[in-house]
């Protein structure tokens, strides 16, 4: 074993020890994973916290059963007591705990009928207020208690952001462990089957592993945690490294079979590195373009991906070649996979006209889907519709809403928010909001005051409203009024739970409708906050970054294609070919109404990066040979090998039980196949004026023949 290989193995072992001991590999997903504290979108949240006493970290448990039976109410009492004993739970509000005390009282209560009684009268809610910093620890304990109390007559279901966040984190962690490992093994299996060399297999696996490890070490050193998007970064970096290695190895193999070549490794590096460098540069700048987005997960992905693209090329050309030196020269026999690749390529090449037509027709058919993109999906879309989790979340959502929205209002005429006139307007606004189709429940100042009057009828009716509010601000009353009115009495707060199940409009459009309702009732909507609007803003940023990012990427690829090719026609053909990939992927998302969530949204960018890799290698080869057919004969195998390995590796993500992972894997699978076929056929066709004219002419002839036969 050469000394260089021994040093690489030792470095790999040390890197594994370091990442195991010092780098947290659990995805960090908390209730603030949408934005960082300095993002403009969170400034409204900070302002609301300054104005009001908030208890925003809530968990909602729905208990379905015969809600009027004593046995049901006894169970509610028992589970409420068990939950209240958990460390990290601030309060428990239920039918029997810090609530109305009985079903009749709840139904007659202005507050409790809105807060804990479901719309279908088949369940009641248990509202848990959590300590935010302990919410991730509390959720598993709450689930344990739910399991111990649940039976066929007492069905317990949960909702609320802390619960959803914990489930997303679990799914990401499971997929990180299972599917990334499976992808790693599948990549290795195919590399060995294609090249039939243990040295190449070992070099590929060690190089790709080091690329992932070193990227995570560097990102950890600059305080970028593994988050909701960077959880799949390991597979992306593995693929970027693997792509460089596949092209390098095929070139090395071609030079080794050339009797005039003295040093196949150096010659292979000399031929492969320039296109690899340009491919890396496009990917690097593409990831950097995400830094302009004010959504923390996308910025983290941008930095991590940019670092990963640099590490990938360094590892591919500094680590892997040492293992090529260990490969013993011997007669090479084609593996079964290579025979399959040859047959596949021949079949594709024979029917290339149909392949080109199918790609263009598919792109045109899916084009209307771009106007139907579901770019603002609900949190329900993160879970399988047939699963118990989705069904539970959906039930709670339909019966009172599940996504919180805070409205801070002030009067148009400058009156105090609790004046007689304003108080009547607050009730009118309360009732108008409750009539909105997207609003599940509303709690506001008039509801709280009405509840106080009901509980102390004599004092409540006699006592002036300002004194009643002062009493409700006392610690003995849990300072409840401070959550709904400011000290200067100028601002009032409405706490809404929004319904996601039936939503057809983007969240921000619904918030705009609510703003108009607020103004029609005599108030200005000063601030809108909480998860509902944050998700709406995130969705807007994702689609904006997707469109802007893709436009910048394609422009960037065009510039680099011109630098590499020195031809405007080839540059234009690259731009058109690259455009086909995201248009088809996103068009399919729209046509089939597949939710474009924050996890699956970057998939088209990743697929484009892979497509440009093959195209740049082909452009460099064309400058050398000046013949596209010779270029295909030389590069079809590394292009298709890369396509097969990557497509199968990401294809296993379709077997995940976590829909965002399925969508991410499926999008890259489709994009990888499109990228390879456009690189092999569409780009060369568009760049050759004569061939394009001949192809269009032959297509017209065939269309005329078909038209003649049909008549």
Residue ranges and their predicted role:
Residues 83-89, 295, 399, 430-437, ...:
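Acidic-histidine catalytic/liganding microenvironments
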Residues 74-83, 138-146, 421-433, 507-517:
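Short amphipathic alpha-helices in soluble, non-transmembrane regions
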Residues 34, 40, 351-470:
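Juxtamembrane segments of multi-pass membrane proteins
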Residues 28-87, 421-423:
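Juxtamembrane extramembrane loops of integral membrane proteins
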């Amino acid at each position: 074993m050469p000394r260089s290989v021994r040093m690489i193995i030792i470095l790999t072992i040390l890197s594994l020890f370091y990442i195991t001991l010092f780098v947290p590999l659990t995805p960090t997903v908390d209730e603030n994973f949408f934005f960082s504290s300095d993002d403009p979108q969170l400034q409204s949240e900070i302002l609301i916290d300054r104005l009001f006493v908030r208890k925003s970290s809530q968990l909602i448990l729905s208990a379905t059963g015969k809600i009027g039976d004593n046995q049901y109410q006894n169970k509610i009492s028992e589970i409420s007591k068990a939950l209240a004993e958990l460390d990290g739970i601030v309060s428990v509000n239920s039918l029997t705990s810090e609530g109305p005390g009985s079903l009749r009282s709840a139904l007659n209560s202005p507050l409790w009928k809105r807060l804990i009684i479901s719309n279908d009268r088949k369940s009641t809610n248990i509202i848990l207020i959590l300590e935010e910093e302990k919410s991730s620890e509390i959720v598993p304990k709450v689930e344990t208690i739910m399991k111990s109390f649940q039976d066929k007559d007492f069905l317990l279901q949960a909702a609320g952001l802390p619960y959803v966040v914990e489930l997303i984190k679990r799914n990401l962690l499971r997929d990180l462990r299972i599917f990334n490992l499976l992808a790693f093994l599948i990549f290795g299996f195919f590399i060995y089957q294609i090249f039939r060399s243990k040295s190449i297999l070992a070099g590929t696996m060690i190089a790709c592993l080091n690329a992932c490890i070193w990227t995570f070490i560097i990102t950890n050193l600059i305080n970028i945690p593994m988050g909701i998007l960077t959880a799949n970064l390991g597979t992306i970096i593995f693929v970027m490294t693997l792509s460089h290695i596949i092209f390098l190895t095929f070139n090395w193999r071609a030079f080794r079979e050339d009797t005039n070549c003295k040093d196949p490794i150096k010659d292979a590096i000399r031929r492969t590195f320039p296109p690899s460098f340009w491919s890396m540069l496009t990917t690097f700048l593409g990831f950097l373009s995400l830094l302009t987005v004010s959504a923390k997960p996308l910025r983290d992905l941008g930095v991590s991906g940019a670092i990963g693209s640099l590490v990938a090329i360094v590892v591919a050309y500094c680590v892997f070649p040492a293992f090529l030196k260990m490969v013993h020269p011997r007669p090479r026999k084609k593996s079964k996979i290579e025979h399959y690749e040859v047959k596949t390529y021949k079949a594709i090449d024979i029917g290339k006209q149909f392949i080109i037509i199918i790609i263009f027709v598919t792109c045109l058919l899916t084009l209307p889907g771009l106007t139907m993109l579901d770019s603002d999906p609900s949190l329900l879309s993160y879970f399988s519709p047939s699963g118990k989790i989705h069904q539970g979340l959906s039930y709670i959502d339909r019966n009172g809403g599940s996504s919180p929205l805070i409205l801070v209002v002030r009067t148009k005429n400058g009156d105090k928010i609790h004046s007689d006139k304003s108080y009547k307007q607050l009730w009118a606004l309360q009732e108008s909001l409750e009539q909105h189709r997207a609003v599940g429940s509303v709690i506001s100042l008039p509801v709280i005051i009405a509840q106080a009057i009901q509980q102390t009828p004599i004092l409540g009716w006699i006592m002036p409203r300002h004194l009643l509010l002062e009493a409700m601000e006392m610690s003995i009353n849990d300072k409840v009024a401070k959550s709904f009115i400011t000290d200067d009495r100028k601002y009032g707060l409405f706490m809404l739970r929004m319904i996601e199940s039936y939503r057809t409009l983007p969240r921000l459009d619904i918030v705009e409708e609510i703003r108009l309702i607020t103004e029609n009732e005599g108030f200005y909507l000063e601030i809108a906050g909480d998860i509902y609007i944050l998700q709406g803003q995130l969705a807007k940023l994702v689609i904006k970054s997707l469109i802007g990012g893709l436009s910048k990427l394609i422009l960037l690829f065009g510039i680099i294609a011109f630098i590499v090719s020195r031809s405007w026609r080839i540059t234009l053909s690259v731009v058109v070919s690259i455009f086909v990939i995201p248009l088809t992927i996103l068009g399919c998302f729209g046509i089939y109404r597949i939710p474009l969530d924050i996890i699956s949204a970057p998939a088209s960018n990743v697929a484009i990066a892979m497509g440009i890799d093959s195209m740049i290698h082909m452009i460099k080869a064309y400058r050398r040979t000046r013949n596209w057919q010779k270029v295909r004969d030389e590069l079809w195998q590394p292009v298709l090998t890369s396509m097969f390995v990557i497509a199968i590796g990401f294809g296993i993500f379709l077997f995940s039980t976590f829909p965002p992972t399925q969508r991410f894997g499926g999008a890259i699978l489709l994009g990888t196949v499109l990228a390879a076929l456009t690189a092999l056929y569409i780009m060369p066709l568009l760049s050759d004026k004569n061939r394009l004219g001949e192809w269009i002419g032959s297509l017209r002839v065939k269309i005329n023949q078909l038209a003649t036969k049909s008549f």
